[in-house]
């Protein structure tokens, strides 16, 4: 019986360990596009900290600092884009949520940015 328990423990999936940050991988927000659109927010963060942030409507550069499980986003001003009021509000909310992110974790292909509003992103498969 003890041998079976040891074998089971050895073959069971390990608890999710913090892996390496997925630099240079496109990450798509784990939400459906808004009605009438195919777009969802996308993050692409380089190992040098330079990032491209595509929100619901606007896009622009950012600087991202990653140290262990800590992360900090500094978004540059983004040019206005013609959008519906709903998308403009969603952009403002997403930018505010990214500015408040303090940590991250990865489980499989899901990267969770942790702050007052957790944000789940899926690694792109293309």
What are the language-model segments listed below?
Residues 2-10:
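Bacterial N-terminal signal peptides
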Residues 9-126:
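Lipid interaction determinants
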């Amino acid at each position: 019986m003890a041998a079976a328990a040891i074998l089971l423990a050895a073959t069971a999936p390990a608890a999710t360990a913090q892996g390496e940050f997925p630099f240079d991988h496109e990450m798509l927000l784990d939400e459906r596009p808004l009605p009438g659109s195919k777009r969802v927010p996308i993050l692409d963060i380089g190992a040098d900290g330079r990032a491209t942030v595509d929100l619901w409507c606007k896009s622009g550069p950012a600087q991202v600092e990653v140290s262990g499980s800590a992360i900090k986003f500094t978004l540059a001003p983004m040019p206005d884009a013609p959008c519906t009021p709903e998308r403009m509000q969603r952009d403002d909310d997403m930018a505010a949520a990214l500015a408040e992110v303090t940590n991250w974790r990865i489980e499989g292909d899901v990267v969770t940015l942790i702050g007052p509003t957790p944000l789940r992103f899926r690694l792109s498969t293309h």
